[in-house]
Amino acid sequence: MGALQWLSITAAAASAVSALTPEQMIGAPRRTEVIPNPSGDTGLFSTSQWSFDTHSESTWWSLIDLESGETTTLTDDSDIEEIIWLGSDSSTLLYINSTNAQVPGGVELWIADSSDFANYKAASLSAGFLGIKSTVTDSGDVHFILRGKSYPNGTAYNDQLAETYPSTARIYDSIFVRHWDTYLTTASHAVFSGTLQSSTSDDGNVQYTSSGGLTNLVNPVKGAESPFPPFGGNDDYDLSPDGKWVTFKSKAPELPLANNTAAYVYLVPHDGSATAFAVNGPDSPATPEGVEGESNNPVFSPDSDKIAYFQMATNTYESDRNVLYVYSIADDTITPLAKDWDRSPSSVTWVDGDNLVVASQDLGRTRLFAIPGDAGTTSSPRTFTDGGSVSAQYVLSNSTLLVTSSAFWTSWSVYTASPDEGVINTLASANEIDPELSGLSSSDFEEFYFDGNWTTLQGWITYPQDFDSSKKYPLAFLIHGGPEDAWADEWNLKWHSKVFADQGYVVVQPNPTGSTGFGQQLTDAIQLNWTAGAAYDDLTKAWQYVHDTYDFIDTDNGVAAGPSFGAFMITWIQGDDFGRKFKALVSHDGPFIGDAWVETDELWFVEHEFNGTFWQARDAFHNTDPSGPSRVLAYSTPQLVIHSDKDYRIPVANGIGLFNTLQERGVPSRFLNFPDEDHWVTGQENSLVWYQQVLGWINRYSGVGGSNPDAIALEDTVNPVVDLNP
């Protein structure tokens, strides 16, 4: 275990960088949200950092003083999976050790003191578990819950001890076959509960030891699963503060998983003495009429009497508007709060027994909003934060919250705020700590507004290092995915606009029709409208606005790039006159052939977007097919195509098909493939190659490669290039 070490994180980094490079951005420390102790004077977080010298990652845990911002290194034990505060004692920690000396593939629970990390083992668990939550009950015992995989009979599934078969065959009688990056198996995910019994030694110290086994709280509900992979996690379940109840979210077990988004919030005793009941399911008298979409983020009130959660109205629509509901356990009633508010919040925190705070996308940021417990249907929640994007918020005292956020210019910011005072005290910001990020400033980024196809739209501009408005910089035009998504004021490891800009570009990121955080009407308008009207027209109008407004942007030598839906738009642009406005194009994991959507994993998505299956809505599928012969004949702009083997949302054949077509049309093109990545590229070494190839490609054709001696080139990648042409 590492010794405690003091580090000031409020002083500015010693040296400034001339530009943000991919190596600096990827290799900078990555910190988690800060979790306060019960007294609210100390926070806990972890940090990981990749080294391109050793090609390895280091991880350590730290404490931060919530008055001064000073931090201490708590431990650098790489076997520790996660740590939480235990009970009302502000110095006791409970953590999961990722190894188990007695059970291969198992984990252990340990108790430690935050002052010196003196520790002892409290329990041995027979499988891999994550996401522990706990509370100390009136008896002094610890009730806890955690998540893991489960056999169909409800017992915990251990990957290392699971039965193997002579054949590798997979056999399916229903969909899903695969999801995101994984083929589904008979093992599912579940929330388990357990108890640590307390005892007091002769010297007065309290110790905790395992009491009994674990109880699977999800398995008794046939077909239920929680959390649901790949994006389900700790926010999908909660433990009541009194330790008596557990709530969890599960997709509707009676509906086909690949075709539906409907999900319910369940309530179950911690000891599993009764089967979990869906409080807003079809059998509940409390279920609001006409509300049939996905539920998420169930959270108990401080008095354990209520559950706050979000739910969408429409089944099959993953980007419908979240509405905040409160379920009363005693009354078996559900009450909506601020039901008509035109935002879609994503996380909720109880400030006290009645009042709540939610985080929601709002005009290209994620802000905090206060919602009183008696908020009526037409109530308009009030925001009390501004720039950046909140990732976590915890109540300290007197309605003060500890907030973790990020922004374009900082990967991690920690501050206190309250609904009455707004931001109170900034404790830490990564760009003032990390040498890799020093020199980044909010002044490098600004928003702009332009007239789109049918409404005023927002976008972002990122300036290069040492920007001079008297000079001209090639345009880098980035199109976001989704399409129900948005470019936001947040740290983006996959598409960081400043990394693009510091090659010598002015980066423009428009938020067209379909974008989120600007009202539900803008989001909903993308349905059946990918190319025939608003969304595509919005992008051309954004380009024209930039061309007409900013003398320092060189649109003659511009480039365009985008992921997923953005990649679809890139290829659609390739087949249109608009494609000739750009010197180079980059498409990452985009669809190419319209009918190939039948291969996707989440069928609910495409069947909602195009209003039917591919045989019911043939015109909609064909009208958004960039591989149509007339479009292919127009292909001429150099294009980099990126697609990875484990992308089951938009399978890799789409990328190979596009590359084949470009090659046969004689268009300068390259195919970049990662066999171990999915719809996103997240591995650090792979991410570096991704940036090298993307930036090298656009630099070659925009002229930046010739004007900037430090510009990245395609040849910077050490991997060999396969070229079988004679």
Curated annotation (Swiss-Prot):
Organism annotation: Aspergillus niger
List of catalytic residues: 564, 647, 679
Gene of this entry: dpp5
UniProt main location, coarse: secreted
Glycosylation-annotated residues: 97, 153, 259, 398, 453, 529, 611
Superkingdom to which the source organism belongs: Eukaryota
PANTHER family linked to this entry: DIPEPTIDYL-PEPTIDASE 5-RELATED, SERINE PEPTIDASE S9 FAMILY MEMBER
GO molecular function: aminopeptidase activity; serine-type endopeptidase activity
EC number: 3.4.14.-
Subcellular location: Secreted
Protein name, as recorded: Probable dipeptidyl-peptidase 5
One GO BP annotation of this record: proteolysis
Keywords carried by this UniProt record: Aminopeptidase, Glycoprotein, Hydrolase, Protease, Secreted, Serine protease, Signal
Entry GO terms, CC: extracellular region
Known role: Extracellular dipeptidyl-peptidase which removes N-terminal dipeptides sequentially from polypeptides having unsubstituted N-termini.
Signal peptide from the UniProt entry: 1-19
Keyword Hydrolase listed: yes
